[in-house]
Curated annotation (Swiss-Prot):
The lineage of its organism: Eukaryota, Metazoa, Chordata, Craniata, Vertebrata. Keywords: Cell membrane, Cytoplasm, Lipoprotein, Membrane, Necrosis, Palmitate, Transmembrane, Transmembrane beta strand. This is Gasdermin-A. Belongs to the gasdermin family. The keyword Lipoprotein applies. It comes from Mus musculus.
Amino acid sequence: MTMFENVTRALARQLNPRGDLTPLDSLIDFKRFHPFCLVLRKRKSTLFWGARYVHTDYTLLDVLEPGSSPSDPTDSGNFSFKNMLDARVEGDVDVPKTVKVKGTAGLSRSSTLEVQTLSVAPTALENLHKERKLSADHPFLKEMRERGENLYVVMEVVETLQEVTLERAGKAEGCFSLPFFAPLGLQGSVNHKEAVTIPKGCVLAYRVRQLMVNGKDEWGIPHICNDSMQTFPPGEKPGEGKFILIQASDVGEMHEDFKTLKEEVQRETQEVEKLSPVGRSSLLTSLSHLLGKKKELQDLEQTLEGALDKGHEVTLEALPKDVLLSKDAMDAILYFLGALTVLSEAQQKLLVKSLEKKILPVQLKLVESTMEKNFLQDKEGVFPLQPDLLSSLGEEELILTEALVGLSGLEVQRSGPQYTWDPDTLPHLCALYAGLSLLQLLSKNS
């Protein structure tokens, strides 16, 4: 994870443990998640690695008829946090020019993060609803209606009260400075320091509620939503062949144990397993070329979502033909692309290396074993590791594995052996588990 993700996930966990407060993943996007901003949720998302929202560059006010502006969001309280995070080695941190970056990421003992929560007042929303209708001819609304998208309104945010620089000396093991990792974009040494400055007014986490459109220009934002609710009335969407992905896990259902994650991943791998041997091999080749190119993976994800929206066959060079002939297969691939794009580019490159060295089964077993024992563990701790989990690995393979899981927050120490469990890293470990499961399946017969 990047340092910014470490900050936002830990903050969301402390303010709203296992709740509906969504941590912001990218510092560069914080201005697009202010109150009243309209966002989209990824169709094939899962709460295991977070309901994933993407900005739209529009606010609710932009798509309403002209009229009076609502009152400013109200302040719901201030909070201060000290010693909130533990820095971890990471690859290059991708942040906007306005953010000062030194090294790669963490929190110093002297740093204090002061935040406030801002929310849209119920009276302000009620007055806005009475006074301003939807602009029915707005191009953005027309496009979203045509695609059958669900829109969400940011209703509450947690933002910084002042600029703060978070820093701490890196905890890199010696292995991270070996030349072996240079091509993977990993850096760090025992004494390496890292820091990032987060600007005042930066949104760190947010809550959303679904926008509902009734008829041509009526709208509402209900307090409670379920997975059957859609922003636009179903009867108004053209084309009956559209394929809309809806999962029970998309709407606030919290998962109780590792078994639920395992079953979810197995359901998706079963769809991939139905592909022909040639199709699976082709898919593995395509993914091997894309891993480490996060932007290209994200572009493929968006294109595939678009293909599902259109409801007809499309041609995608990155995917084998029999994937595109099956909506269920496309659905499953979209699920795994969501998991892989959660991982850093460095981790994606490590996955390719692991694939080449045929050690994916060992890595999958390691992640599965630790999550099975600690999935509900809500406190940090050091736990013994079964020696046989790593005994089959050579030195280079062991280093590779330590780096791969370490970048998801699972620190493995050979002495013992043992590992450090941090509950804040659970979403990233879930994504890594899904990614390993897919690649292991695809590589079995290759």
